[in-house]
Amino acid sequence: GSGKYNFVERTAAVERLVREGRYVEACEARYDAFVDLAALLPDEEALPLRWEHPNSRAALSIIYGSAVDHFRIGDLEMSMAQLELLLECDNEDHFESVNLLAMCYVACDEWDAYDDLTLYLSDKSGDAVVTRLWAAFRRSGRVDEQLLALLRSRHRAYYDELRAEEHPDDDAFRRDISSDRP
């Protein structure tokens, strides 16, 4: 791609803004790139993008990054739409976006959509286990002890954070949540 369709350059520009601490501008630049990309994609059918192609991989990164941005500001409807588009374009789910999409579905009480997605939530992912634990709690009002035990045994850092009485907001936390893969 060239010009505004060179998503490698646009991703690099976003990353530069993030490094400079210009987060709002980075989010806006990423969203603008997403809008340009979405205008290229057909409306009726999925257009898988090739991960091996640098511009396609950068385009997928833009979709995921913008979805995360919208999730962070609480625009879950936009985040869901972007994540659904991402899964259509990246059927191998290189970003494990299914986990964030499942979390959005739970937050928005989209239970049918969540149920359809649970097949793809792996016990190997701490995010997926936390999402399943949260969904079970939202539905029943009780903590699923089996999922809690799974979290404790396989994803101890997640378990410890869940059970912690305090959640300090330190530099390491801020770096983590401002990264592409928080």
Predicted regions and their residues:
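Helix-capping and short linker residues that terminate individual alpha-solenoid repeat units
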Residues: 38-39, 85, 91, 126, ...
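Hydrophobic, aromatic-enriched interface-forming segments
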Residues: 76, 80-119, 128-131
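Alpha-helical repeat scaffolds
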Residues: 1, 26-33, 76-84, 110-122, ...
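Flexible helix-coil transition and linker loops at the boundaries of alpha-helical arrays
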Residues: 1-3, 32-56, 87-89
